[in-house]
Amino acid sequence: MTVLKLRVNDIRMSLRKEQTLKECVADKLGIKKSAFRKVQVVHRAVDARRKNNICLLYHVIAEIEVPQSLGQKIVKRPGISLFVPVQAESPHMGDIPMTERPVVIGAGPAGLVAALELAKYGYRPLVLERGRALHKRVEDVNRFWETGDFDPASNVQFGMGGAGTFSDGKLTTRVNDPVMGEILQAFVKAGAPGEILTEHKPHAGTDKLRDMVQGLAAEIESYGGEICCETQVTDFVVKEGRIAGLVLNNGTVLSTETVVLACGHSARDTYHVLAEKGIGMEAKAFAIGLRVEHPQSLIDKAQYGDFAGHPRLGVADYALVYHTEDRKRAAYSFCMCPGGQVVAAASEAGGVVVNGMSLYNRDSGIANSALVVNVTPEDFGTEPLAGVAFQRKYEKLAFAAGGKNYKAPAQSVRTFLEKARPDIKDAQKYLRESAGQGSGRDGVKQNCSVWAGVFPSYRPGVTEYALDSILPSYVSDTLKQGLRYFGQRIHGFDGPTGILTGVETRTSAPLRIIRGADYQSVTHEGLYPCGEGCGYAGGIMSAALDGYHVARAIMKKYKPF
């Protein structure tokens, strides 16, 4: 007999059959269940391409004890191989001594992961976060949502954890990098749900994500790092083309030669300071549009058919794309939040911005997603800050349309398509009847007006308004074409139960801080542009990954502090 540890891929488990995972693995290997010592899931996905036979798809590590001759045959079969563990790569330390501690600007996913990596290896980073600590930030945001009392210093964009703290907590990325597993392990250690290690579409939810942020902060501090909230960088000290220090909002001048710039995509005042300093940057494409809400039951039925509501499936999501005939524009779903709510995400006074958020349980009964259209410097100008001005223009239009009180303009999908008078009553009635119920946690009033039976879910409220007038015509026209196409893909998507709320403008940074192969600014040595705000990521995981690589680039150059 021999003991083998195998990687077994593509194990299909039909929801139509009453079969355990171990039985499915045994069938694939051609062995008895008694031969197993251990089965560990490493990946789980849903295959819903055939609505009449939805399957769960697993990759596992199986430890088995079988005759040697049988083991030799098993490892030659397709999708089966001997398991070889991947060891984390230790960083290569540089020889240059650091004269001052490295500073990380921003405590979002990029900044926190960069700081954690630096702290673990003795670099003692100092993290400067302009917004407030997490518990205070949650109070501020809830007050804004309830009363419209906006605080530019503490909101959905600024504060401990970054913008992702009020999101669905999606931990997916299209970037294929072996470091991703290491980052997910760090997130679980910090408090994220363990299943993010195995789910094809992992998500933590905004509630669990907050636990994770607190855990990451504690670990950074345990290694000798330091985190200072309500500490904004207002200027950069530059000497002979390199960073020499930072000026803080309390007047302090902080000496440092190494700065990780992970400011987030809404730090527009920081962008202006960087431009005044001549730090190399360029305008880049992004997307703007609206948020759409539907009954979650409509999406579940469209994606899962008769299996909708099956306890092993959870709620369904979607990813939709439409290209115009000339291929110049695309309308697409972005940041889809099953069982969530639309949230007020402004970071400047006098502007309305919407975003989506879900809790871990995703149980609001409402599905929402951004529906956005790509825009490029050809639309708004090639000057580096032109995209910021473009975003701000439509945020101010939305603010005025909502009543200048942070209510958002909203309209039913039907009237948006038909250019009819805005009327969301039909959609409200249907949604009110189909909404689920949620439960409170951590002092956060969950799902807000959704659970109160009032729709749309955006707080502090909405004003019915023709959304055509607060978007460029090429955006609204493309959205209408896209909505009709999406209605062919998901029955009812363009029907009377859909509600649109505007505007969604913060899909990604409108500019890029240019860096070289060494991750440093091409114009200012010692400045390391990092994460989504500098144009190098598009979500929690890609931002975290960029923070990791920036930290490793610093280690490659310097000795620990």
Question: Where do the PLM segments sit?
Answer:
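Residues forming the flavin
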Residues: M1-I54, V60-F166, K170-A190, G194-F561
